[in-house]
């Protein structure tokens, strides 16, 4: 008697089923984004704390913008990337009036998943770093899935 054990296969979401050519995306591609920190970007205004310095969610938003700048313009028509994972540390405060600069470098391609190494700096020092993952989706298929979720 022979037994064969197989792990259950993860079901691929429908918006990821079609194969697309991402060969024009290359490891090492970089994007960046900048922001002048204003009162509207502080933790009290965002709702993430009480100290009037750059809010972590704003830094993360800038990191995602840097990742978009690296690759979004190279994606095939009808496709875009969506953020699916962040592992970021925010380790230095930035006051209102100071400029911040975020960078994202594409370090790995795994099918439709794009993995970035990310960093953020203010005018004086590094303020955050980590990794960020995005997945490339067919926008029409993704929108259909969202409409089904809404019951439309």
Model-derived features: positions:
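Intrinsic-disorder/low-complexity, polar/charged segments enriched in Ser/Thr/Lys/Arg/Asp/Glu/Gln
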Residues: 26-32, 85, 99-101, 113-115, ...
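Catalytic strand-loop segment that frames the active site of acyl-thioester-processing enzymes
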Residues: 20-54
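C-terminal output/interaction extensions
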Residues: 128, 133-152
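Hydrophobic beta-sheet segments that form the core/acyl-binding groove
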Residues: 88-123
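Hydrophobic beta-strand-centered segment that forms part of the acyl-chain substrate-binding groove
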Residues: 68-101
């Amino acid at each position: 008697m022979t037994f064969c054990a197989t792990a259950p296969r993860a079901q691929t979401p429908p918006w990821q089923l079609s194969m697309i050519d991402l060969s024009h995306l290359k490891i090492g591609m970089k994007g960046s984004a900048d922001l002048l920190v204003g009162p509207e970007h502080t933790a009290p205004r965002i709702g993430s704390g009480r100290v009037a310095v750059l809010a972590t969610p704003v830094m993360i938003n800038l990191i995602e913008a840097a990742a978009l700048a690296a690759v979004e313009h190279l994606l095939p028509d009808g496709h875009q990337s969506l953020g699916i994972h962040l592992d970021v540390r925010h380790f230095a405060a930035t006051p209102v009036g100071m400029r911040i600069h975020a960078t994202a470098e594409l370090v790995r391609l795994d099918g439709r998943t794009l993995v970035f190494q990310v960093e953020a700096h203010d005018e004086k020092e590094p303020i955050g770093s980590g990794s960020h993952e995005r997945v490339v989706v067919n926008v029409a298929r993704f929108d259909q899935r969202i409409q089904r979720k809404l019951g439309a």
